[in-house]
């Protein structure tokens, strides 16, 4: 099976960017995320993003740091992912994948930290990598 969609978790990067917006590390995070977004969009992947940030805070942070056009590349954004939902049995990745119309076997996860990558792996995403590795390699995620 071919990877059709990528669900992204970038909370660790967002925390760093919020805490030290002018630092070299935050600048590198922004550049890596933008490079990855450009690459994933050019490859034709459907993109979803899962974040624990509340929707208004996420929107202000993302648009302020990356621009509205970058946010528009995501087909779905699942905000408040750390809060218990009405249907607590539904994982935030389930919500994103359902909205993207892709089974987890045909989706990859890209994360900004090892903890986020492990979470996606435990959830059962077919491929789980850190954003810095994907951006450095600049290679398609390939097959499941």
Where are the model-predicted features located?
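Acidic, Mg2+-coordinating phosphoryl-transfer loop and its flanking beta/alpha structural elements
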Residues: 104-139
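Asp-based phosphoryl-transfer active-site loop
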Residues: 1-22
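Surface-exposed amphipathic alpha-helices with a cationic face
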Residues: 37-42, 97-98, 117-121
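Substrate-recognition element of Asp-dependent hydrolases with the DxDx(T/V) motif
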Residues: 33-63
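Substrate-recognition "cap/lid" segment bordering the active-site pocket of phosphatases
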Residues: 55-108
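A structural signal for isolated positions on well-ordered beta-strands in alpha/beta enzyme cores
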Residues: 46-48, 76, 108, 129
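Short beta->alpha linker loops
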Residues: 28, 32, 53-54, 88, ...
